[in-house]
Amino acid sequence: MDIVGGQNLRQMWDDLAGVYGDKTALIFESCEGIVRQFSYASLNEEINRTANLFYSLGIRKGDRVALHLDNCPEFIFCWFGLAKIGAIMVPINARLLGEESAWILQNSQVSLLVTSAQFYPMYREIRQDNSTPLNHICLIGEQLPADDGVSHFTQLQSRQSTTLCYTPALSTDDTAEILFTSGTTSRPKGVVITHYNLRFAGYYSAWQIALRDDDVYMTVMPAFHIDCQCTAAMPAFSAGSTFVLLEKYSARAFWDQVRKYQATVTECIPMMIRTLMVQPAAPTDRQHHLREVMFYLNLSEQEKDDFTERFGVRLLTSYGMTETIVGIIGDRPGDKRRWPSIGRVGFSYEAEIRDDQNRPLPAGEIGEICIKGIPGKTIFKEYYMQPEATARALEPEGWLHTGDSGYQDEDGYFYFVDRRCNMIKRGGENVSCVELENIISAHPKIQDIVVVGIKDAIRDEAIKAFIVLNEGETLSEAEFFSFCENNMAKFKVPSFMEIRTDLPRNCSGKIIKKNLK
């Protein structure tokens, strides 16, 4: 089913500006509460100015430009400005340090970077090391340095025409972005995303949440992440909705912001749900316009019930990854939900559970979740410059091996068990970290929990739990292990526990387990 019809991102924005004109497209709120607002017409003009800025700096079709930015309107300008001239965006996780950022610059062969003043000292050192092709930095902000090879984004952009001066031929098969995966267990891989991928994501995700042009989609997810781009921004713009982008997440401010912008749709990760739940209850908890909350794994049933009861919202489960572009398995508005199912496969996709020999498994049996799509259209095109990794993950017929364990029931509902790399092998038994985390998170004193496997000379791996307690609480080892013994099989009970003040996370809230082992 071709729902894109040959429309690239340049044509998309020209059409949106013509159709929606003065309607509000983007609202941005900074951490200081400063609000910037753009109509569809004015946002398209800013995108065109930015495209011309890149052209003035020598960027042409096929060139790669890195963005290292926190959430800001300039990210949107650059993302689509590059797409309009056929150039390729390489977003860099704003939490990465120098060595990791330099590795991405080197592996994507980026010569131009757009970043903000706070990150400039790190990139000045990277340039001085001459370890990457980076030769020019375009800075966003005020009181910027006048160093060689540095230009000021706002000054350059404001001088540009709102009419594109460079319009190379574009195809929906052209690469629009190389998005490096989070790399929680190893070096990240560059996921190649096309114009078609992004256009499809807009239509698909808008369908998934029944988005309309009178909706307001608010997100705090980082703009450099696939969730913000393909589950929030693209569907909001594709539907002619208003997209509200917040600079940073604040549990204290979240519901006030939902009410302020009259948001009807938002997205949450487990960390957000847990921190929202520890905020003091208020009479206004249910006073909002939210009809759907897009939700990403993992959450216990008790946490889900407590959240929906307190705030009067529905959690719309969505399962996917960078390589699938969108949530290819999920719930749908109005459909009956079958918790803890992650939902059913969406249109344009197929899904199977496969065994270790790549054979389909019947309902009820646990195996690897495999997804069939069209590379470069409904799933990613390839890993950038990594043909062997691409071949391991993606079969010629379009079957993607997710590396996740799960099963399906007789009615076609899928159930997530764990990341395959998250399974602990303990004395001949496979133990799911997610299962243990869901059980332990029910302890009333525990705010956050992660379980990892550590080497054990006798049983292959031992189980260790890292715990963050609710404010003011204490928890003895005896109390912890007693709780575990009463709620899980003996072979699943952790051997060790460690209380910490926080847990290391990547940009999407996923815990970086390699930092704990």
From Swiss-Prot:
Entry-linked PROSITE patterns: AMP_BINDING
Keyword annotations of the record: Ligase
Enzyme class: ligase
SUPFAM superfamilies in alphabetical order: Acetyl-CoA synthetase-like (SSF56801)
Enzymatic reactions: 4-(trimethylamino)butanoate + ATP + CoA = 4-(trimethylamino)butanoyl-CoA + AMP + diphosphate; crotonobetaine + ATP + CoA = crotonobetainyl-CoA + AMP + diphosphate; (R)-carnitine + ATP + CoA = (R)-carnitinyl-CoA + AMP + diphosphate
EC code(s) of this entry: 6.2.1.48
Pathway involvement of the protein, from the record: Amine and polyamine metabolism; carnitine metabolism
Keyword Ligase recorded: yes
GO biological process: carnitine metabolic process; fatty acid metabolic process
GO molecular function, one term: crotonobetaine-CoA ligase activity
Keyword Signal: no
PANTHER family xrefs: ACYL-COA SYNTHETASE, MEDIUM-CHAIN ACYL-COA LIGASE ACSF2, MITOCHONDRIAL
Protein family per UniProt: Belongs to the ATP-dependent AMP-binding enzyme family.
Function: Catalyzes the transfer of CoA to carnitine, generating the initial carnitinyl-CoA needed for the CaiB reaction cycle. Also has activity toward crotonobetaine and gamma-butyrobetaine.
Name of the protein in question: Crotonobetaine/carnitine--CoA ligase
Lineage, broadest ranks: Bacteria, Pseudomonadati, Pseudomonadota, Gammaproteobacteria, Enterobacterales
Gene: caiC
